[in-house]
Structure formats: structure tokens, C-alpha cells
Amino acid sequence: MSADIRFDSLKTIVPAVSRETADRLIAFEDLFRKWSKAINLASPSTLADLWNRHILDSVQLFPLAKEATRWLDIGSGGGFPGIVTACFLAERSGGCIDLVESAGKKAAFLRTAAGHLHVPARVHSARIESMWEKIETPQVVTARALASLGDLFTLAEPWLSDGAKALFQKGRDYQREIDESRVGWSFDLVKHPSAIDQASVILEISNLRRKTD
């Protein structure tokens, strides 16, 4: 896929995307492919369609909170959506994203990617729970393919209950996860359809509170 085709595909999601951001995302794809030969950053079956399946899918989040400058991505894995978001924040004065990833090799890749792309990302090789008191409450918390919605609430509760908004990407079972999570939690919800996968959504969560008997 040529750079121009990838740039045009980006503009279908973020019409005002700059060429500089597009170049960073293309460079990230190239770096991801190189590292994937040595460590498992994503399912091998998805690498053939890496641009659409992972990068464009992650791009969708930034326009939903484009005014935010302080982001946090938990369980960052191979950098989706964390490094992708960082590519957009690179052109935002004061923008920064914290990436939390417990797997050492993946955290090493994230650090390499952040440095290679010159993006404002801080990588924490640690368990999410250990960062509750170390990372200041961001404006937005993101997660992709990490855990069930209820478990995500538990992992991100210190930040979400302090005013942060969540953007969680979910697959075809999202409604079941929503229903199950409402047993123990109250929250405001906006469902954004995915532009990449018709069976998926982005759940925008705010005002999270744990229910008490």
C-alpha cells in the first residue's frame, strides 16, 4: 500500500490530518513490522492488514477527544492505540500520553517507537495497579483488547472516578459487557460505531461510580 493511499485512508477518519502525522504513522507501521519478526506484538494473522486492522482502528479515538492533551493508555501492548494517539499529540502543544505495559519486551518496543517517532509518550513497564498513585489523572483513558468492561472499570477506577473520560474499544459482545458491568457500576455512556469494523464500537464512559448496597 503506497504512502498516498494510506494518507487518503487517514483523511476519511481525520479529514484535517497533517502529512507529518501521516508520516509518523507510516513510520510506526514499518517499525512495528520489523519488531514483529522478533517478538509477538500482535496476532500474526492480522499483520497482512496491519494498517486497517490496527492503525486506522486506533486512529478513530483521537477525534472523539481531540481537545484533550493529557491521555493515558493502559495495557498498551504493541502501541494500539497509545503510540497512534501519541503521533497526533506530537503536534499539540503540551500534549502527552502515558503508556502502561507490564510485559518487558513490549515496553521496550514502545520506548523505541516513542523515541524513533519523536512523540510525547512516557512508557511505564509496570502493572496498571502499581501506577494508580503515580500517574496524575488524565483527561482521557484508553484501552483496546485488554479486558472485559467491568475489569477495565476496576483497573481504571482511580482515574475515572476522579473525572477522566474513558474511550474503550469493544467487539461484537459489547452489549453483554455493558449489561454485566451495570450490576456493580453506574456511568454515563455514549456508543460510537466503528468506522473499521461494523461489529465493533468505541464506548465513551464518564461519571463512573461504584454502586453500593
From Swiss-Prot:
Q: Is S-adenosyl-L-methionine among the key words of this record? A: yes
Q: Which domain of life is it from?
A: Bacteria
Pfam families per record: GidB
Cell compartments where the protein resides: Cytoplasm
Q: Which UniProt keywords apply?
A: Cytoplasm, Methyltransferase, rRNA processing, S-adenosyl-L-methionine, Transferase
Q: EC number(s) per UniProt? A: 2.1.1.170
Which principal EC class is assigned to this enzyme? transferase
Query: Does 4Fe-4S show up as a keyword for this record?
Result: no
Q: Which InterPro entries match?
A: rRNA_ssu_MeTfrase_G (IPR003682), SAM-dependent_MTases_sf (IPR029063)
Chain positions recorded as S-adenosyl-L-methionine binding sites: G75, F80, I128, E129, R144
Give the catalysed reaction(s), semicolon-separated.
guanosine(527) in 16S rRNA + S-adenosyl-L-methionine = N(7)-methylguanosine(527) in 16S rRNA + S-adenosyl-L-homocysteine
Any one GO cellular component localisation term in the record? cytosol
A single MF term (Gene Ontology): rRNA (guanine-N7-)-methyltransferase activity
This molecule's function is given as: Specifically methylates the N7 position of guanine in position 527 of 16S rRNA.
Matching entries from HAMAP family are given as: 16SrRNA_methyltr_G
Give the protein family: Belongs to the methyltransferase superfamily. RNA methyltransferase RsmG family.
Identification of the protein by name: Ribosomal RNA small subunit methyltransferase G
Originating organism: Brucella ovis (strain ATCC 25840 / 63/290 / NCTC 10512)
Gene assigned in the entry: rsmG
